[in-house]
Every structure is written in structure tokens, then in C-alpha cells.
């Protein structure tokens, strides 16, 4: 497979520049016959989750295609689902560059992107043009300049705009790169948010005559008590699923490595064990009442199987995809 050569060239570039270059090429081919260049035939392995049928259990995690620009090209690679976003009500530039760093030896990434995106209206226009036949998740967040106490308004605005076009909606309250965002995972703040989201979901179901499930994406840095509390809230408010996990602030496994001191969320192989442990504990607390989408450091068939063994119904990749390329998709879907 050609990817090792492509990777070598891309890794000569600054990480964000490499991402932009790759997406430039994918944008050129998306929706054209040239999509055949990235198309991979993978086996169909249907999985039912949140009332939806996924053609296989592997998805692309949020954060790679923030604006839904390359849905068809990414879909052609064999993913059963794509989660686009995180998108916010209004466009925003994100944090200052540089804001994305490779930890090559650890096969990890640190990012402090800060929800850079072109806004929810732009994303919806891109979704309307796409022909992806898998499940499309849309991950939503709040604008940086929206006070945390008004944060739920941003989620409701986004829900309203994406509802008609989403297979499921992911609520991102766990990015470490938007000040105060993670506080929405705790106690009354979480309950208030989930009540508002559930009410909005019911209203939108009545308007659109279809039920779009909602999943909440959580952090890997929750202590035992917080994890129990989150699980309890998700069950009490009849949320449809949970995505575990986002990136970590923990640097214990990458001490001494180049870029390890950069602020932001760490993903990739160093997150693998931590996210699997959260999935395992969450699975015990949820007791089969709520499906888990497992994400965090999946870079092989074994890593994907470990997530499923810990309690995940579906799995997603991001950093592993950057380091291993499209062959990882085929490998996981074939052997999972």
C-alpha cells in the first residue's frame, strides 16, 4: 500500500499544513469519479446501535472533517459512519497557531485547535451535497465567546439546524480547548443541559417526524465519582448513547518526548489504555442500558477489539488513521 510513502511526505510538513493539504486533495475528488482513487471495498458487518443500523462498526471520530467538506471521499474509504464537526453556531477561527503537534515516537497527537470551524450553516450546506450511504453523525459545541452559563443555547441552536440532516447528534462537552466547557459534564450543569437537549429533541421529532438519537461525548479524565454521576445523568435523561472518550490532559505516558509539554488534548496510542478503562467502568455503570461508542488510541484490530471487549458497541478512529492511513480501516473492518 502506498500510504507509508504518503505519510513520509506529509510528516515533512507542519501537522496542520499537512492536514490542509490532504483535505485540499480530498475536496478536489469528493463527489467526482476520482473518488475511486481512495475507494476501498470492505466487508459489510451490520451493527445496530441507538436504533440505527451501521453497515460496519468502524467510524471516523469528530475533529478531522470539522466542516463536512470531504464526506463522500472519506466515506469511500470504508467507514460505516462519519462524525463531522465539532461545529458551532457561528464561525470561529479557533486558537492561535501552532496548535497541532505530533508525538511521532508515541504515535500520538496534541491539539489545542479550539473548535475552529466555518459555522453550522456552512456545514449543513456541505451535508446537503453529500451522498454518503453510511450513518452521518454531527458533533456540536459552543462558541468560545458564549459564556458557559449560556452554553446550552448554542447546543440548541445547532441541534435545530442539523436535526433534519443528521443520523445522530453528538454533544461535545469534553474538549479541553474551550475554556469552561468540561464543567458542563458535572452535576446540575449537566442535568440542565441534558433536560434542554431532550426537550429540544422531542420538539424536533414532532416537527420532522423522525427520531434522531443524541450521544454525549465525555472526557477520559473523570474521577470515579464523576464517572458514576455522568452515567447516572445519562440514564435519568434517556440520552441515546455515550461516546468515550475525548482527548486527555494526562501526560504521564509521554514524559520526556518531543512536544509532550504542549498544552491541549493528547490523543493516539498514549490514550488507548485510559479510554478503554473509562469504557469498562462506564459499561459496568450503564449495565447495558445505553450503548457506548469507543474511541481513543485505536490503531490496530486488537485495540479495536479491546474497546469492544470493554463494552463498546461501535468504535471510532482519528489519530490511528493519521499514522496508519486508509489501510487501517480495511484491516479493522475485515478482522473485528
Swiss-Prot record:
Q: Which PROSITE patterns match?
A: DHODEHASE_1, DHODEHASE_2
Q: State the function annotated in the UniProt record.
A: Catalyzes the conversion of dihydroorotate to orotate with quinone as electron acceptor.
Please give, as recorded in its UniProt entry, the membrane topology of this protein: Peripheral membrane protein
Residues holding FMN:
62-66, 86, 139, 172, 217, 245, 268, 297, 318-319
| Gene Ontology CC terms, in alphabetical order | cytoplasm; plasma membrane
Q: What is its EC number?
A: 1.3.5.2
GO terms in the biological process aspect are:
'de novo' pyrimidine nucleobase biosynthetic process; 'de novo' UMP biosynthetic process
Active site residues per record:
175
Pfam family name, one: DHO_dh
Chain positions recorded as substrate binding sites? 66, 111-115, 172, 177, 246-247
The record's similarity note reads:
Belongs to the dihydroorotate dehydrogenase family. Type 2 subfamily.
Cofactor(s) required, per the database record:
FMN
Which reaction is catalysed here? Answer: (S)-dihydroorotate + a quinone = orotate + a quinol
Gene that codes for this?
pyrD
Top-level taxonomic group: Bacteria
Q: What is this protein called?
A: Dihydroorotate dehydrogenase (quinone)
* Localization terms from the record: Cell membrane
- Which GO terms fall under molecular function for this chain's record? dihydroorotate dehydrogenase (quinone) activity
Quaternary structure (record): Monomer.
Keyword terms: Cell membrane, Flavoprotein, FMN, Membrane, Oxidoreductase, Pyrimidine biosynthesis
List the CDD domains. Answer: DHOD_2_like (cd04738)
InterPro entries, per this entry?
Answer: Aldolase_TIM (IPR013785), DHO_dehydrogenase (IPR050074), Dihydroorotate_DH_1_2 (IPR012135), Dihydroorotate_DH_2 (IPR005719), Dihydroorotate_DH_cat (IPR005720), Dihydroorotate_DH_CS (IPR001295)
Q: How is the cofactor bound?
A: Binds 1 FMN per subunit.
Species source reads Salmonella arizonae (strain ATCC BAA-731 / CDC346-86 / RSK2980)
Tell me the route in metabolism or biology where this protein functions. Pyrimidine metabolism; UMP biosynthesis via de novo pathway; orotate from (S)-dihydroorotate (quinone route): step 1/1
Amino acid at each position: 500500500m502506498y500510504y507509508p510513502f504518503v505519510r513520509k511526505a506529509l510528516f515533512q510538513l507542519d501537522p496542520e499544513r499537512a492536514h490542509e493539504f490532504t483535505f485540499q486533495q480530498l475536496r478536489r475528488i469528493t463527489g467526482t469519479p476520482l473518488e475511486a482513487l481512495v475507494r476501498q471495498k470492505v466487508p459489510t458487518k451490520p451493527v445496530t446501535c441507538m436504533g440505527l443500523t451501521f453497515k460496519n462498526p468502524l467510524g471516523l471520530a469528530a475533529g478531522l472533517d470539522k466542516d463536512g467538506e470531504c464526506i463522500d471521499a472519506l466515506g469511500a474509504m470504508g467507514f460505516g459512519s462519519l462524525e463531522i464537526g465539532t461545529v458551532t453556531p457561528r464561525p470561529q477561527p479557533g486558537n492561535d497557531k501552532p496548535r497541532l503537534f505530533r508525538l511521532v515516537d508515541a504515535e500520538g497527537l496534541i491539539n489545542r485547535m479550539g473548535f475552529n470551524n466555518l459555522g453550522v450553516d456552512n456545514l449543513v450546506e456541505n451535508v446537503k451535497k453529500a451522498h454518503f450511504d453510511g450513518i452521518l453523525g454531527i458533533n456540536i459545541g459552543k462558541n468560545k465567546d458564549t459564556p458557559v452559563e449560556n452554553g446550552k443555547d448554542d447546543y440548541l441552536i445547532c441541534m435545530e439546524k442539523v436535526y433534519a440532516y443528521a443520523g445522530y447528534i453528538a454533544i461535545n462537552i469534553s474538549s479541553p480547548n474551550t475554556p469552561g466547557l468540561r464543567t458542563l459534564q458535572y452535576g446540575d450543569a449537566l442535568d440542565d443541559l441534558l433536560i434542554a437537549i431532550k426537550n429540544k429533541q422531542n420538539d424536533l421529532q414532532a416537527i420532522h417526524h423522525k427520531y434522531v438519537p443524541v450521544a454525549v461525548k465525555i472526557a477520559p479524565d473523570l474521577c470515579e465519582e464523576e464517572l458514576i454521576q455522568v452515567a447516572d445523568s445519562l440514564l435519568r435523561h434517556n440520552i441515546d448513547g455515550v461516546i468515550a472518550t475525548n482527548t486527555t490532559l494526562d501526560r504521564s505516558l509521554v514524559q520526556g518526548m518531543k512536544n509532550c509539554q504542549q498544552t491541549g488534548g493528547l490523543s493516539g496510542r498514549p490514550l488507548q489504555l485510559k479510554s478503554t478503562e473509562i469504557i469498562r467502568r462506564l459499561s459496568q455503570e450503564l449495565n447495558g442500558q445505553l450503548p457506548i461508542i469507543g474511541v481513543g488510541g485505536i490503531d490496530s484490530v486488537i485495540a479495536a477489539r479491546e474497546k469492544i471487549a470493554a463494552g463498546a458497541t461501535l468504535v471510532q478512529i482519528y489519530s490511528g488513521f493519521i499514522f496508519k492511513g486508509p489501510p487501517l480501516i480495511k484491516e479493522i473492518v475485515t478482522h473485528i
